[in-house]
Amino acid sequence: MIETAIYGKTVDDQSRCVHWHLPKDVIAIRFKCCDKYYACFECHQELSSHPLEKYDLLDDANKHLIICGVCRHEMTFAEYYDYNSNLICPNCRSPFNPGCKLHYHLYFQNPPPAMC
């Protein structure tokens, strides 16, 4: 099986990057403009040469937009968000960073409100 690539200024093979590298920083997000997973918004901005285009969470509800950097399980936003309430990957149970919800607006159109 071919492993899905995660782009960015990564510092390990679990999607952590120079910008976000705490133990729970193990997701990457697909960008509509290039259809690639990047470790973070900053990595995309620094490494791509095209304007950012975000997926719309209403129109693209069935598209895999999030990938777990640990097991490479791809998720729709709804699947990620449902399990994110537990802050874990639904496949490998790796913990996710709860602070990611504060940045949904950087990655998606029509994001849910960030709740503390």
UniProtKB/Swiss-Prot annotation:
<feature type="binding site">
    <location>
        <position position="40"/>
    </location>
    <ligand>
        <name>Zn(2+) 1</name>
    </ligand>
</feature>
<feature type="binding site">
    <location>
        <position position="68"/>
    </location>
    <ligand>
        <name>Zn(2+) 2</name>
    </ligand>
</feature>
<dbReference type="GO" id="GO:0005758">
    <property type="term" value="C:mitochondrial intermembrane space"/>
</dbReference>
<dbReference type="GO" id="GO:0031966">
    <property type="term" value="C:mitochondrial membrane"/>
</dbReference>
<dbReference type="InterPro" id="IPR037274">
    <property type="entry name" value="Znf_CHY_sf"/>
</dbReference>
<dbReference type="InterPro" id="IPR052604">
    <property type="entry name" value="Mito_Tim_assembly_helper"/>
</dbReference>
<keyword id="KW-0862">Zinc</keyword>
<feature type="zinc finger region" description="CHY-type; degenerate">
    <location>
        <begin position="10"/>
        <end position="94"/>
    </location>
</feature>
<dbReference type="GO" id="GO:0008270">
    <property type="term" value="F:zinc ion binding"/>
</dbReference>
<feature type="binding site">
    <location>
        <position position="71"/>
    </location>
    <ligand>
        <name>Zn(2+) 2</name>
    </ligand>
</feature>
<dbReference type="InterPro" id="IPR016694">
    <property type="entry name" value="UCP017292"/>
</dbReference>
<keyword id="KW-0863">Zinc-finger</keyword>
<comment type="subunit">
    <text>Interacts with the small Tim proteins TIM8, TIM9, TIM10, TIM12, and TIM13.</text>
</comment>
<protein>
    <recommendedName>
        <fullName>Helper of Tim protein 13</fullName>
    </recommendedName>
</protein>
<keyword id="KW-0472">Membrane</keyword>
<keyword id="KW-0479">Metal-binding</keyword>
<dbReference type="GO" id="GO:0045041">
    <property type="term" value="P:protein import into mitochondrial intermembrane space"/>
</dbReference>
<feature type="binding site">
    <location>
        <position position="17"/>
    </location>
    <ligand>
        <name>Zn(2+) 1</name>
    </ligand>
</feature>
<feature type="binding site">
    <location>
        <position position="19"/>
    </location>
    <ligand>
        <name>Zn(2+) 1</name>
    </ligand>
</feature>
<keyword id="KW-0496">Mitochondrion</keyword>
<dbReference type="Pfam" id="PF05495">
    <property type="entry name" value="zf-CHY"/>
</dbReference>
<dbReference type="InterPro" id="IPR008913">
    <property type="entry name" value="Znf_CHY"/>
</dbReference>
<keyword id="KW-0813">Transport</keyword>
<keyword id="KW-0653">Protein transport</keyword>
<keyword id="KW-0811">Translocation</keyword>
<feature type="binding site">
    <location>
        <position position="43"/>
    </location>
    <ligand>
        <name>Zn(2+) 1</name>
    </ligand>
</feature>
<comment type="function">
    <text>Required for the assembly or recycling of the small Tim proteins in the mitochondrial intermembrane, thereby participating in the import and insertion of multi-pass transmembrane proteins into the mitochondrial inner membrane. Probably acts by facilitating the formation of disulfide bonds in small Tim proteins.</text>
</comment>
<feature type="binding site">
    <location>
        <position position="89"/>
    </location>
    <ligand>
        <name>Zn(2+) 2</name>
    </ligand>
</feature>
<feature type="binding site">
    <location>
        <position position="92"/>
    </location>
    <ligand>
        <name>Zn(2+) 2</name>
    </ligand>
</feature>
